[in-house]
């Protein structure tokens, strides 16, 4: 056991043991940063950090723009895009999304990307949540919005190398089939979880526990 760890008793109601270190003892401070690779989609840095206890290390950080996912709901159906993903060499069915311009309001990006990819213009936009795509590597965030009161403009504005099919499927079918071969994008799972919380799916079965900062009190 690390000397800073605190062993807590078993919680008989939820049945787990946790080794707890106060947040202030977990923090590392950045002391240096060096750009080692620039790409069209993100920059790679070598970042030097020092922990409170004196440990030091070099860590790789990917700096990318803010990302957007737009859940578009149209009369009980999700508006989805199906496209080729070059890294996985596979077709995926997912929610529309894109990249924010520097300083751009994420809600503006979410509405714009939806219209560009699907032709649907939203009447209302609701922010469902913001998450880190992978805090171990990426420094940016993913903003997730729900678009409703949709109007089909009949016009799309795809990038030169984009070739996208637009499909509409029942909400329940998409939720049921997530994590199948067709629905493999992890961001879609996060977006679905936030959507289900917003709509109140199964909230009566969720157990709420004490905030971690109150555990030692």
Regions found by a protein language model. Name each.
Residues 13-38:
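Extreme N-terminal tail/first-helix region
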Residues 32-69, 74:
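Acidic, metal-coordinating catalytic segment for phosphate/diphosphate chemistry
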Residues 57, 64-69, 74, 98-187, ...:
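Unchanged
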Residues 73-75, 80-82:
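Glycine/small-residue-rich phosphate/adenosyl-binding loop
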Residues 87-93:
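A conserved beta-turn-beta hairpin within the catalytic core of GNAT-like acetyltransferases
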Residues 190-208:
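Charged phosphate-binding loop/patch that engages nucleotide di/tri-phosphates or the phosphate backbone
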């Amino acid at each position: 056991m690390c000397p800073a760890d605190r062993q807590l008793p078993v919680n008989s109601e939820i049945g787990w043991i946790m080794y707890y270190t106060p947040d202030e003892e977990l923090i590392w401070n950045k002391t240096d940063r060096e750009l080692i690779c620039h790409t069209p989609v993100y920059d790679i840095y070598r970042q030097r950090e020092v922990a409170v206890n004196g440990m030091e290390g070099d860590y790789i950080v990917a700096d990318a723009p803010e990302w957007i996912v737009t859940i578009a709901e149209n009369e009980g159906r999700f508006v989805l895009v199906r496209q080729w993903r070059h890294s996985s060499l596979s077709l995926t069915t997912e929610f529309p999304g894109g990249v924010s311009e520097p300083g751009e309001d994420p809600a503006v990006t979410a509405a714009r990307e939806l219209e560009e990819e699907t032709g649907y213009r939203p009447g209302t936009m609701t922010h469902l949540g913001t998450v880190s795509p992978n805090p171990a590597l990426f420094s940016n965030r993913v903003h997730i919005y729900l678009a409703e009161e949709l109007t089909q403009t009949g016009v799309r504005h795809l990038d030169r190398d984009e070739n996208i099919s637009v499909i509409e499927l029942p909400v329940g079918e998409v939720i049921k089939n997530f994590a199948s071969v067709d629905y493999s994008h992890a961001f879609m799972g996060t977006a679905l979880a936030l959507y289900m919380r917003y709509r109140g799916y199964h909230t009566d079965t969720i157990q709420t526990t004490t905030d971690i900062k109150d555990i030692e009190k």
